[in-house]
Regions:
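RNA/tRNA-interacting regions in translation and RNA-turnover enzymes
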Residues: 1-314
Length: 314
């Protein structure tokens, strides 16, 4: 983990300097290994969600130590591909957000970090995929547009990830180890959500598992379809921004997608506009209990990493 942080730091820091910076930022360090491949154990709380990856932590340290300007926007290419959301998902998993990631130069380490971050988000912040489930797929075998719809479980059949045989959704929930872990999330549902392409190839059964044939990412894949499904679009957008920020640091270009809800006459597209907060210097000083000068307020505000802009009335 420490090695990962150092790869994207703007200055070479010792493990003690990194540890102290994290403590000063209010992070809770749970321990540090003593071997040559030192690891820091850090508790990431919900309000610091953008620091779930080592890239996010490095970016925050860079801003806090004034090694770079805080990142407040994400370059986004306007895309033409679509995800079409069917009304059938309304009662089971009604929302999704999505982008296409292009020209990602993957290696084994980067791919493992993506997988690790995906698992950390699911297990630590998303109530084991109840609030949000992330799906990542190579687009080379996908025919657009993509459909997000729900079907009776007996009508869903594909080869789940890391399995040798095709199975029905009913079988997966009973027999597949990963699916059994999350089966309670679909308990009692008459229909299950799926992502499929325009050729009716099933990409995944969220929040359970991807297809082995269309949802397995390898290091040679450069272009990916990334989706997050759940119930609250604002929250899903935040999760997607966290993933997109990490992938961009890895060298990827991010292309927006239109997520069309025909039954609601509504279209979603990734919102990367920074949040704008208007605060007075007097109010800030009253919160911290110290009278701050104009320059001190500006300097401290710039230490804050994340997609936020502060309009400060000085």
């Amino acid at each position: 983990f420490l090695i990962d942080i150092r790869l994207v730091m703007n200055k070479k820091l010792s493990i003690d300097e990194i540890s102290q910076a994290l403590i000063d930022m209010g992070m809770d360090l749970k321990g540090q290994s003593e071997d040559e491949n030192s690891e820091l154990k850090i508790e990431i709380t919900a309000e610091k969600f953008d620091m779930i990856s080592s890239i996010g932590i490095a970016r925050a340290i860079n801003s806090y130590l004034e090694l770079q300007e805080p990142v407040i926007n994400i370059p986004l290419i306007r895309g033409k591909e679509r995800v079409i959301v069917d009304e059938s998902v309304k009662e089971v998993r009604p929302k999704t957000v999505a982008v296409i990631v292009r020209n990602l130069d993957l290696n084994a380490e980067k791919l493992q970090q993506i997988i690790d971050v995906q698992e950390k988000i699911h297990e630590s912040f998303e109530k084991k995929k109840k609030k949000a489930a992330i799906g990542i797929y190579p687009i080379e075998n996908i025919s657009f547009p993509i459909y997000f719809k729900a079907l009776p479980p007996k009508n869903i059949k594909f080869q789940p990830l890391e399995s040798d045989n095709e199975m029905s959704a009913t079988q997966m929930l009973k027999e597949h180890q990963t699916c059994k872990k999350y089966a309670h999330l679909l308990e009692g549902a008459k229909v299950y959500p799926i992502f499929s392409d325009s050729n009716n190839n099933i990409l995944s059964l969220p929040p359970l598992i991807n297809s082995h044939t269309t949802g397995r990412v390898e290091t040679y894949h450069k272009d990916l379809f990334v989706e997050v499904s759940g119930h609250n679009e604002h929250h899903l957008n935040s999760v997607l921004i966290t993933l997109v920020s990490m992938l961009q640091v890895m060298g990827a270009e991010v292309e927006s997608m239109q997520v069309e809800y025909a039954h609601e006459n509504y279209t979603y597209e990734l919102n990367v506009d920074p949040k704008i907060k208007t605060l007075s210097r007097e109010y800030i000083s009253s919160l911290v209990g110290v009278e701050l000068t104009n320059n001190e307020v500006i300097k401290l505000a710039k230490k804050k990493s994340g997609l936020e802009l502060f309009t400060i009335l000085l």
